[in-house]
Design a protein with these regions (language model features):
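Short, acidic/small-residue loops that bind anionic groups at enzyme active sites
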Residues: 100-125, 131-140
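Buried hydrophobic positions in well-ordered alpha/beta secondary-structure cores of metabolic enzymes
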Residues: 22, 84, 117, 220, ...
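ATP/NTP phosphate-donor binding region
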Residues: 2-80
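Conserved anion/nucleotide-ligand pocket segment
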Residues: 134-217
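A short helix->loop->beta-strand "cap" motif at the edges of active sites that frequently abuts
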Residues: 80, 105-111, 128-130, 271-272, ...
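N-terminal glycine-rich "phosphate-gripper" loop used for MgATP/nucleotide binding
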Residues: 85-94, 99, 115
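C-terminal active-site/capping subdomain that shapes the small-molecule cofactor and substrate pocket
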Residues: 252-352
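Oxyanion-binding "anion nests"
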Residues: 212-254
Length: 352
């Protein structure tokens, strides 16, 4: 594994019966849709054996950034809290970051799980020397539907409790959106699922093992624009770049623009491998026919893989892994080790 200059701590795991904070660093979906949230909390304990603890802004819709940051700081400061989970993403977490206390996180690092807008916190932790886990929105992946998807439950337990190494495999089905959380059917029904195809591999047939960095592409752009990645691209040398896109459904052309900017920043050249998540291509208002959905996914795949190839033809690229805004979702290490085998076409994640 390539060693990078910026060392990262991997927080210790929780033990069954211990407490984990459930926070709303962005949108407080727990307050807007409490029935789904409460089912998520029950399932969290069933799947992990851990006890969820809510904070003042967990259910407070519209809480100020300072108040949300105070809850994050309090969770890191409490020695009884052994992990932190975000309820969901949002769109203004960038305003929370200036109010966080890095000293508290460094004194008692603990696993943090979240996706989408929580890319802000992942990068704040990474910059302060703490690894985390990308994925795990309780409002999306624990509360809705008849149960928790197997791949999500396995990676959730690994991230919080067991720390095992797992091969990341395709679940065989996917949904872009579930049932509206305000609809009682959300507690019992999945969204419209469709079969998935094979992942798409690009670049040389070689094995790359390194630590991961990345997240939601639209938020990575914000992080870099705000100057909150205070390193040169060499700190990512040989690592695994994670890229996924949000429910905003950016056209492939716009996605390509952001990826090209990462290339100009030197980030694509530094990566040993790139994992690109299966993108959502529909929402509640826009549900194209199956052929159009397949075309939209292929268009993004071709643009992203082509752009990476221009800047780094030696990178191993795998497109289609469900670690982003679709469900079922794998939680992946952020700052931890991932092995991408372009020869055997396998991906293995170390959750220690």
């Amino acid at each position: 594994m390539t060693r990078m200059a910026h060392d990262l701590i991997r927080p210790p795991k929780a033990r069954r019966g211990e407490r984990v904070a459930v926070l709303s660093p962005s949108f407080a979906a727990a307050g807007a849709f409490p029935a789904v949230h409460e089912q998520a909390m029950r399932r969290l304990t069933e799947v992990t054996g851990l006890i969820p603890v809510e904070y003042p802004t967990t259910r407070q819709v519209g809480a100020a950034p300072q108040a949300r940051a105070a809850d994050i700081n309090a969770a890191f400061a409490d020695p009884a809290i052994r992990g932190i989970l975000a309820v969901v993403g949002g769109e203004d977490q960038i305003t929370v970051i200036p109010h966080l206390d890095a000293g508290l996180a460094r004194r008692d690092p603990k696993p943090f799980l979240g996706t989408s807008d929580n890319t802000n916190i992942h990068h704040w932790l990474w910059a302060n020397g703490i690894a985390s886990f990308y994925g795990g929105s309780s409002q999306v992946h624990l509360g809705p539907g008849p149960g928790v998807d197997d791949v999500h439950a396995r990676s959730l337990r690994a991230a919080l409790v067991t720390g095992e190494t797992i091969e990341v495999t395709d679940p065989g089905e996917s949904e872009d959106v579930g049932v509206d959380w305000g609809d009682p059917r959300a507690l019992d029904c999945f969204g419209d699922r469709e079969p998935t195809g094979s992942w798409s591999w690009h670049g040389p047939a070689r094995l790359v093992s390194g630590r991961s960095w990345g997240g939601c592409l639209e938020v990575i752009e914000q992080v870099l624009t705000a100057g909150r990645f205070p390193f040169g691209p060499d700190v990512l040398d040989g690592g695994i770049l994670l890229i996924e896109t949000s429910e905003e459904l950016l056209p492939a052309r716009n996605v390509g623009w952001i990826v090209r900017a990462l290339g100009e920043r030197g980030i694509l050249k530094a990566a040993g491998a790139v994992l690109v998540a299966r993108p959502p291509v529909s929402d509640f208002e826009r549900r194209p026919p199956a052929e159009e959905r397949a075309r939209l996914r292929a268009e993004q795949r071709d643009v992203v893989a082509g752009m990476i190839g221009q800047y780094n033809p030696e990178a191993v690229v795998c497109v289609g892994i469900p670690f982003g805004h679709t469900r079922p979702q794998w939680i992946l290490p952020h700052g931890g080790a991932i092995t991408v085998d372009g020869t055997a076409r396998r991906v293995v994640a170390d959750y220690s």
